[in-house]
From Swiss-Prot:
Pathway: Amino-acid degradation; L-arginine degradation via AST pathway; L-glutamate and succinate from L-arginine: step 2/5. The gene is astB. Substrate binds at residues 19-28, 110, 137-138, 213, 251, 364. The keyword Cytoplasm does not apply. It catalyses: N(2)-succinyl-L-arginine + 2 H2O + 2 H(+) = N(2)-succinyl-L-ornithine + 2 NH4(+) + CO2. This is N-succinylarginine dihydrolase. Homodimer. It comes from Yersinia pseudotuberculosis serotype O:1b (strain IP 31758). InterPro entries: AstB_sf (IPR037031), SuccinylArg_d-Hdrlase_AstB (IPR007079).
Amino acid sequence: MAGYEVNFDGLVGLTHHYAGLSFGNEASTTHQNHTSNPRLAAKQGLLKMKALADLGYKQGVLPPQERPAIGVLRKLGFSGSDEQVLSDVARNAPRLLSAVSSASSMWTANAATVSPSADSADGRVHFTVANLHNKFHRAIEAETTAVLLPAVFNNHRHFVHHNALPSVTLLGDEGAANHNRLGGEYASPAIQMFVYGRQGMESGAVPGRYPARQTREASQAVARLHQLDPKRTVFVQQNPAVIDQGVFHNDVIAVSNRNVLFHHELAFLSSTQVMDDIRCKMAGLEQQLVNIEVPEAEVSVADAVSTYLFNSQLLHKANGKMLLVIPQESQDNPSVWRYLSELVSGDGPIDELRVFDLRESMRNGGGPACLRLRVVLNDAELQAVNSRVMLTPALFVTLNNWVDQHYRDHLQFKDLADPHLLQEGRQALDELTRILNLGPVYPFQRN
């Protein structure tokens, strides 16, 4: 049976704004208080989706979450009508209003960790919602994510959905942004690589400036839930030094597809041992690791972070080669572009680059890889996915028109308290659930 790596990209939400909420994410803090353009942000994401779908890649769409999250504010003691809640929090806790209005669910690489059926003992695709414990504005996503994913992957014969791990420091889990899969054909067993920033119950190397968001204990728990074979699972510590330079998730410093791992030389602690372990486990599957390690002398960690070179999408092509999807910022940086130009002109597996303008997302700290959740599916599983979320030319037009109808073209912090913005969002999302055939997935629809 054939297998596919399907990308499910997040639609940017109507409250996309620059609040600097993500300590450790340097783009987020750098652009705090800038004016955003939610309409442009959504269209930039849709254009990337369409371009990849036009190339023949399977492409799905995941909806944004309801924001501002009025229900969260009520749990925190705000009361009265929705308008009164917004007014009260804007006056007395403005940073809290910004947090509950974040459109960060667009970065679906953090929605969940996904293991294909070929790797799971029960032969089903497993999803574990990420608790995103380290950041409040992200942690509040888990409840709705746990409703959205079963609305898309809605067949118990093929899909297993696990709720988020307990939201405690010991079990901080950031989802697929700290997870890679290395092997051959998508439908065949592969090695699952979990990357963590620190150990919660043991001493060890940790960053000193920025937080390590993912724990080894969380990664191990997800692997157990997904019924993975320990012989085909590796747990790797990210280099604390690069976390302190703004590499808040592993997908800011590494990306993989099939048997190719593209990463910075400083990405991992004990890198030589890590690569030896992966090679050994891949050999058990009769696969050979192709390790593309970018030297610090050619591309510094600082340049990798500012351009999101590794927050790219590595896509397998029909001719056996690979395509690298990069943000415009990578082309604009002389040293990064020089490296990439030499890379694709060589005899390695990556022979093509596609550049996308994703500046609205990039300024908040999310590149091409952040915007997508990779889900490996075989033919039967792909047929079991809610077909209305799969991007077609007609759906692209419908979603573009939907964005034009509902999204504002500029947004500042003061706009978040506007009750009209809340109503605009609910009207738009209610319509979107009908377009994508999701059912009542949002709190306002269920209440």
